[in-house]
From Swiss-Prot:
Family as reported in the entry's similarity comment: Belongs to the ATPase epsilon chain family.
GO biological process: aerobic respiration; mitochondrial proton-transporting ATP synthase complex assembly; proton motive force-driven ATP synthesis; proton motive force-driven mitochondrial ATP synthesis; response to resveratrol
Keyword list, A-Z: Acetylation, ATP synthesis, CF(1), Hydrogen ion transport, Ion transport, Membrane, Mitochondrion, Mitochondrion inner membrane, Transit peptide, Transport
Major location (coarse): mitochondrion
Superkingdom of the organism of origin: Eukaryota
Molecular function in Gene Ontology: protein-containing complex binding; proton-transporting ATP synthase activity, rotational mechanism; structural molecule activity
One Pfam family cited in the UniProt record for this chain: ATP-synt_DE_N
Protein name (Swiss-Prot/TrEMBL): ATP synthase F(1) complex subunit delta, mitochondrial
Subunit structure: Component of the ATP synthase complex composed at least of ATP5F1A/subunit alpha, ATP5F1B/subunit beta, ATP5MC1/subunit c (homooctomer), MT-ATP6/subunit a, MT-ATP8/subunit 8, ATP5ME/subunit e, ATP5MF/subunit f, ATP5MG/subunit g, ATP5MK/subunit k, ATP5MJ/subunit j, ATP5F1C/subunit gamma, ATP5F1D/subunit delta, ATP5F1E/subunit epsilon, ATP5PF/subunit F6, ATP5PB/subunit b, ATP5PD/subunit d, ATP5PO/subunit OSCP.
Residue interval of the organelle targeting sequence: 1-22
Residue numbers of N6-succinyllysine PTMs: 136, 165
Amino acid sequence: MLPAALLRHPGLRRLVLQARTYAQAAASPAPAAGPGQMSFTFASPTQVFFDGANVRQVDVPTLTGAFGILASHVPTLQVLRPGLVMVHAEDGTTTKYFVSSGSVTVNADSSVQLLAEEVVTLDMLDLGAARANLEKAQSELSGAADEAARAEIQIRIEANEALVKALE
């Protein structure tokens, strides 16, 4: 909060009011479709998979653990870890995606936004290649020259372990 002395200056008061108006408008997302329904948006930098679609449930992998999201879920903001996102549609079908990282936001109005760095449908992945990449990264770990190289290899190991788990 700005000190009261700053608000006495007419120019600053106008600036503060403009900022508050913008923040209030940006903080009010579009309402969900109705009671008991969940509006779901899922996108990557290159593709939109769902745009305000009504879905029954979304299962997400986060740094604090995997969890399922239903309508009226407690609001939360979580960081995604590499893993499987499962979207359960209203008609009972389930679609599975592999995400590398990103964030998921659950709002009080039952709207959910999932923004992922990279997204791939499972049918586009090769279990054999994931296993080979995992073995290669694990063998490179002991020969890492420095901490930066070691951290990079560890990330590759975690991502490929998640890929193998999702595909098995």
